[in-house]
Amino acid sequence: MKKVLRYLVMTVLAICFTIPLNAAEAATVALLPLVNNVAGDELANQVYYKQAINAIKAQPGFVLVENDQLTQAFENAKINTAGIDQKSLEKIAKDGDVDVVFAMQLDKLARKPLNRTGERVLKLELEGKAFAYNRLNGVYYVHNLKGGKEIDEALTSRWDWAHEEFGRAVRQEISRALRAK
């Protein structure tokens, strides 16, 4: 009986130690700089990085990486001058040795007042694109950003509504891109 009990305990211990050691490795994510085509809006870059880093950290199974090899791959791709396309993202993923590459382009970010009777209303004008390439499954993700939300102007007097909505769009696009199959 002691031998059976000893083998049973050894089996349980072996299972308890081997299961956690077989955990899958996290996929590496490269976050490329924002291609900002909005003149004079430097705050969008800060919002982009802050929201993107937090969104990637919140996704289980993904880890954000930044190294010299990835920086060199980005500089060789010349994304800021040539534009973002599938081939350039594939090249960055291959040369930078990362699993997922995410990039975003912002073309328009403005608050436009609408003249209506009664309260003044602001309309958000948000245009851009989100790009991602997943080297693990070969999926290329492109999504157009459009913002047409409206809000009373009185509510926006103490906070930056346009950049908050842009940050929300960044979080949504990263979540969608990392789930793309």
Each model region followed by its residue ranges:
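Extracellular loop and loop/strand-boundary signature of outer-membrane beta-barrel proteins
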Residues: 115-116
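Bacterial N-terminal signal peptides
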Residues: 8-20
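Positively charged n-region of N-terminal signal peptides that target proteins for export
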Residues: 1-6
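C-terminal/domain-edge helix-coil "capping" segments
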Residues: 23-29, 44, 55, 92-96, ...
